[in-house]
């Protein structure tokens, strides 16, 4: 099992679907922007509701991220912006950030809402888990923006996404009894699972009373 292959396959699948839906639209369908500008997004798992506004927003060269986002979660966004899109990312007050957040107590525990308008993106959430899932959806959208470019510009479709997991338990199983994996590898797998909103990792540790250890000689 190879973590990079897992994530690369997922991203290529998303981009392939996005390319098919986007390139099927002509200039008249997307407001005169180049054909490769995305008018649709491919998100895994499929959100409950996606409403497109039939327009796009240009990503700024310096994307400001709300200071209200927890540091570890904010770093996920910044790594995508800097490493995947070659854009700079910096912190800003929530009211002045391109990527904003808004806590709403009436949303379910893991629910979120993501809106993309001409002013930027905003994630609505009630818990940090819901915020994380909203961030992961935005990261998937941003990675597709890297594929759809015109000159030096990168675009996101204006959209309103409302989503909540259908199942509380969304698991992934790894058999570490018969196969040896490093701790670093398992951490990468966890990052990949989070990217696709999988919230349980089942480590199959032993088949009997003994604990196996790797013997290389």
Show which residues each predicted segment covers.
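The substrate-binding groove and active-site-proximal loops of carbohydrate-active enzymes
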Residues: 125, 170-183
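Aromatic- and acidic-residue-enriched carbohydrate-binding clefts of CAZyme catalytic domains
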Residues: 165, 209-217
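C-terminal motif of bacterial Sec signal peptides marking the signal peptidase cleavage site
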Residues: 20-24
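Catalytic domains of carbohydrate-active enzymes, especially glycoside hydrolases
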Residues: 185-208
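Bacterial N-terminal signal peptides that target proteins for export
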Residues: 2-11
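Hydrophobic helical h-region of N-terminal Sec-dependent signal peptides
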Residues: 11, 15-19
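Acidic, contiguous N-terminal accessory segments
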Residues: 25-170
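Short strand-loop junctions, especially beta-strand C-caps/beta-turns
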Residues: 62, 68, 175-177, 206
């Amino acid at each position: 099992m190879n973590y990079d292959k897992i994530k690369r396959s997922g991203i290529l699948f998303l981009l392939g679907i996005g390319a098919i839906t986007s390139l099927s639209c002509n200039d008249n369908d997307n407001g005169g922007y180049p054909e490769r500008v995305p008018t649709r997004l491919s998100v895994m798992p499929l959100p409950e509701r996606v409403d497109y506004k039939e327009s796009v927003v240009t990503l700024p060269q310096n994307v400001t991220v709300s200071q209200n986002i927890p540091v570890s979660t904010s770093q996920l966004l910044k790594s995508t912006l800097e490493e995947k899109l070659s854009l700079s990312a910096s912190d800003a007050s929530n009211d002045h950030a391109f990527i904003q957040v808004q806590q709403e107590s009436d949303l379910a525990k893991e629910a979120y809402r993501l809106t993309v308008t001409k002013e930027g993106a905003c994630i609505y959430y009630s818990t940090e888990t819901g915020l994380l899932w909203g961030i992961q959806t935005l990261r998937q959208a941003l990675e597709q923006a890297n594929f759809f470019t015109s000159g030096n510009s990168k675009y996101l479709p204006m959209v309103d996404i409302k989503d909540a997991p259908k199942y509380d338990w969304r698991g992934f199983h790894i058999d570490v009894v018969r196969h040896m994996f490093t701790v670093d590898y398992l951490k990468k797998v966890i990052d990949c699972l989070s990217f696709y909103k999988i919230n349980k990792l089942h480590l199959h540790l032993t088949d009997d009373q003994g604990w196996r250890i790797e013997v290389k000689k």
